[in-house]
């Protein structure tokens, strides 16, 4: 992080004009926006993938597991021992247990996707509805695409000052805080807001 970025973080933490209880959470979301976009895409791809688990898949999986004979009742050796072990596992409900496990994993993945998507929607709604076009573009390029302040200054059509870049990010964080406050009070999204606060605190303490 360069000197401009370091100064920017200090300004975001101490110079914002928004007065509400979600300023820290808004800054946390803004700082992790690019990561959230990547995580959401990865979770979506995983959810859209196959969650099928067949007996053939179970057999392939069991073949690769190192045998632990301490708990086996099978006394034979070699191929017959491996085959018997796999047969015992299959008859003992191995496929059903793995399917149940995968269903739990899919449900956990779905819930995590919904939460990450909610965080992204807070930001996208805030910048779309509460920012002007220039501020919105600056924020999305910096926090969404990871472009530096200098790069934004150099590549913005018509030019833009470093002060304008800093102000755009500050205004964006204020807008996100306002959106969080609105959702907490008016949209009955308290559970997500509390989860976000706990996530932020855990991140800060790590």
Enumerate the language-model features and the residues they cover:
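N-terminal interaction/assembly modules
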Residues: 1-126, 178-206
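A general secondary-structure boundary signal
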Residues: 117, 149-150, 155, 169, ...
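Catalytic phosphate/metal-binding cores of nucleic-acid and nucleotide-processing enzymes, i.e., regions
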Residues: 125, 130, 150, 163, ...
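Short amphipathic alpha helix immediately N-terminal
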Residues: 128-147
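Short, locally clustered residues in the helix-turn-helix/winged-helix DNA-binding domain
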Residues: 140-144, 157, 177
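Helix-turn-helix DNA-binding module
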Residues: 145-164
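DNA major-groove recognition helices of helix-turn-helix
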Residues: 165-183
């Amino acid at each position: 992080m360069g000197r401009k970025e370091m100064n920017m973080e200090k300004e975001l933490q101490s110079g914002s004009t928004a007065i509400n209880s979600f300023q820290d959470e808004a800054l946390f979301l803004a700082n992790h926006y690019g990561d959230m976009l990547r995580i959401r895409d990865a979770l979506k791809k995983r959810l859209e993938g196959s969650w099928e688990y067949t007996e053939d898949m179970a057999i392939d999986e069991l073949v690769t597991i190192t045998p632990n004979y301490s708990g086996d009742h099978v006394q034979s050796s070699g191929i017959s021992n491996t085959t018997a072990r796999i047969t015992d596992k299959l008859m003992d409900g191995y496929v059903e247990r793995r399917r149940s496990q995968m269903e739990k994993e899919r449900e956990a993945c779905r819930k995590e996707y919904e939460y990450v998507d909610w965080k992204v929607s807070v930001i996208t709604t805030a910048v779309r509805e509460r920012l002007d076009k220039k501020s919105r573009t600056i924020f999305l390029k910096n926090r969404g695409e990871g472009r530096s302040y200098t790069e934004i200054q150099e590549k913005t059509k018509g030019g833009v000052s470093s002060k304008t870049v800093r102000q755009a990010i500050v205004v964006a964080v204020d807008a996100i805080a306002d959106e969080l406050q609105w959702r907490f009070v008016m949209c009955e999204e308290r559970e997500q807001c509390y989860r976000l606060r706990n996530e932020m605190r855990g991140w800060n303490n790590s």
